[in-house]
Regions:
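Long, charge-dense
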Residues: 78-117, 155-160
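A domain-level signal for the structural core that forms small-molecule/cofactor-binding pockets
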Residues: 51-52, 93, 111, 127, ...
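Short glycine-rich or small-residue beta-strand-to-loop segments that form or flank ligand, phosphate
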Residues: 63-69, 94-96, 122-128
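N-terminal, charge-rich interaction modules
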Residues: 1-73, 79, 83, 148-151, ...
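Extended, charge-rich low-complexity interaction segments
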Residues: 115-139
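Short, non-transmembrane amphipathic alpha-helical segments
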Residues: 81-86, 138-146
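General structural feature for long, well-ordered alpha-helical segments within catalytic domains
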Residues: 4, 43-47, 78, 102, ...
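Gly/Ser/Thr-rich loops at beta-strand to alpha-helix junctions
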Residues: 69-76, 128-136, 159
Length: 167
C-alpha cells in the first residue's frame, strides 16, 4: 500500500492569513440617533446635554465606531463632537460602522507588514476566517502582496482561485 503524501504541506505555497493580524480588543458602536428627537431631529441643546451626561469611561481602551442608524440628516459637527468626548478613552475612533472600524484598523496594520518575505513566492490569501475580516482588508493585502509575490491565490490550498501571476 502506498504511503499517503500531504502535497499541500510539502508545497512551496505561503499562506497570508488576515486573521493573524486581527487586532484584539473590544469594538463598540455609538448610534447618534439615540440622542436625536424621535431618532431624526438634532436639537443642539438636548444633544449636548446627552453628551455631557453620557459615561464615556465605558469606552476605555475600546475601538469605537460612530454612526447614525436612521436616515436623519446629521450635521458633521455632531460626529466630531462625539469623537472629541471619546478621545480621552477610546483606542481608535471612526465615523461609520464596525466594518468601517475594522477596515481602518487593518489599513494601519497592513501598511506596517514586511511583505518582502513573500518575494517571488506563491501566496494564498486565506479566505475562510472565523473573525470578521472586512473585504477591504483582502483587497488591501492583495495590493501589497502584488508588489512582491510571484502569484497570488485566494481561498485554501486545496481549492484556491488564481488572482495574479507575474509575467
Amino acid at each position: 500500500m502506498e504511503e499517503i503524501v500531504n502535497k499541500v504541506a510539502n508545497s512551496a505555497l505561503e499562506v497570508f492569513d488576515l486573521e493573524d493580524y486581527y487586532p484584539k480588543g473590544i469594538r463598540s458602536q455609538i448610534d447618534i440617533s439615540l440622542w436625536l428627537l424621535e431618532g431624526f431631529l438634532l436639537k443642539e441643546k438636548d444633544f449636548r446635554a446627552h453628551l455631557n451626561n453620557h459615561d464615556w469611561s465605558q469606552y476605555q481602551d475600546q475601538y469605537v465606531a460612530i454612526n447614525c442608524s436612521t436616515d436623519a440628516i446629521v450635521p458633521a459637527w455632531a460626529s466630531i463632537l462625539v469623537s472629541i468626548q471619546l478621545a480621552p478613552f477610546a483606542k481608535k475612533i471612526v465615523n461609520g460602522t464596525i466594518e468601517d472600524l475594522d477596515a481602518a484598523l487593518y489599513e494601519k496594520i497592513l501598511s506596517e507588514v514586511d511583505y518582502s518575505i513573500y518575494k517571488n513566492k506563491s501566496v494564498i490569501l486565506k479566505g475562510c476566517s472565523k473573525k470578521p475580516v472586512p473585504m477591504r482588508a483582502y483587497v488591501l493585502a492583495a495590493n501589497y502582496l502584488q508588489d512582491f509575490a510571484r502569484s497570488i491565490m485566494y481561498g485554501e490550498a486545496c481549492s484556491a482561485v488564481p488572482l495574479f501571476k507575474k509575467k
